[in-house]
Structure formats: structure tokens, C-alpha cells
């Protein structure tokens, strides 16, 4: 979807790192070389990585899918709630990361939150996710 709107896309390979906080460090090292505006998109642990990285670097936006916020064992528990252009999608039936975690963050950040029919992977709601992501990208342009 983002490519349709002329966005460049980079997917960082984290397969060699299981620790979410080390993934944040890798993302920050990649982003420090970036000269253009960018949006971070992350799902589950990737959502945590994206929002945690945005604590340390200026981003145009953050789009999160069932983000692993406020999870035990994750180092960062306070997130930058002052930035604009944060959107979250979370499935009501997520049995891995409670939707209440996204609700808690969205209240603090006063950001867009879409609670939709679906589990952690949101596979049954892919059309809805795609539509919401397209609206998000268009609003940033």
C-alpha cells in the first residue's frame, strides 16, 4: 500500500536477535543514517521496537499492530506520548497481548486506536487493516 503512494520501504532483518531491546538498538542504528522523513510500522514485538525507537529519534509517524506495550521483561515501559501521528490497530480477541495495553497507551498518547474483530495476527481482518493503513498514509501526505 505504501509503495502505491510513492513511499520507499525498508524491512529490517531481526531474525538473529530475539531480545526486543537489542532490536530497538539495531533500528536506531539504521535510522541514524536516514535523511528523509520516515514512518515506523510494527506488529507485536515490532510495535514495541517501533514505539521504543521513537522515544529517541524524530519520526513522521508510528503505525502499530497489536503492539507489545507494557509487557513484562521488556526494558522500556514508558513511551513518548507527546508525538503526533500515532495509530494503533488491535484485535479484540488477542490472547497474546491484551487489547487493554493498547487502550492504556492510546489514552495517554491521545492517539488513534482501532479495536477490531480479530486475534493477535489480525489475519481475518486484513482488508480492514489495509484500509486503515491506507487512510493513515494518505493523511500523512
Name these PLM-found stretches.
Residues 71, 92-97, 120-121:
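Acidic catalytic loop of the alpha/beta-hydrolase fold
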Residues 41-51:
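Gly/Ala-rich beta-loop-alpha elbow adjacent to hydrolase catalytic centers
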Residues 58-70:
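A conserved short beta-strand
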Residues 101, 123-138:
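Post-His helix in hydrolase/transferase enzymes
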